[in-house]
């Protein structure tokens, strides 16, 4: 179950990075980290 959440988080991270949301992806890393 936790692995699924981790995969979802990484997918969202990759999407925001592709969208050019550098600061957004950093906020996500801090939030999940």
UniProtKB/Swiss-Prot annotation:
Give additional notes from the record. Negative results: has no effect on human neuropeptide FF receptor 1 (NPFFR1), NPFFR2 and kisspeptin receptor 1 (KISS1R). Has mild effect on ASIC1a channels (8% inhibition at 10 uM) and no effect on ASIC1b channels.
Q: Which organism is the protein's source?
A: Acharia stimulea (Saddleback caterpillar moth)
Phenylalanine amide-modified residues are 32
Q: Superkingdom of the source? A: Eukaryota
In the record, the note on similarity to other proteins reads:
Belongs to the FARP (FMRFamide related peptide) family.
Metal-binding keyword on record: no
The Gene Ontology terms for molecular function here are: toxin activity
Q: What does this protein do?
A: Is toxic when injected into Drosophila melanogaster. Also shows a low anthelmintic activity against the parasitic nematode H.contortus (drug susceptible Kirby isolate).
Looking at the UniProt record for this protein, which Gene Ontology cellular component terms does it annotate, in alphabetical order? extracellular region
- As given in the record, the signal peptide range reads 1-19
Per UniProt, the keywords (alphabetical) are:
Amidation, Secreted, Signal, Toxin
**Cellular localisation:** Secreted
What name does UniProt use for this protein? U-limacoditoxin(13)-As11
Tissue localization of expression is:
Expressed by the venom secretory cell of the spine. The spine is a cuticular structure containing a single large nucleated venom-secreting cell at its base. It is an independent unit capable of producing, storing and injecting venom. On the back of A.stimulea caterpillars, spines are grouped together by 50 to 100 to form scoli, of which there are eight.
């Amino acid at each position: 179950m936790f692995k699924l959440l981790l995969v979802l988080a990484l997918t969202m991270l990759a999407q925001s990075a592709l969208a050019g949301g550098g600061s957004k992806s950093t906020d996500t890393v801090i939030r999940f980290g």
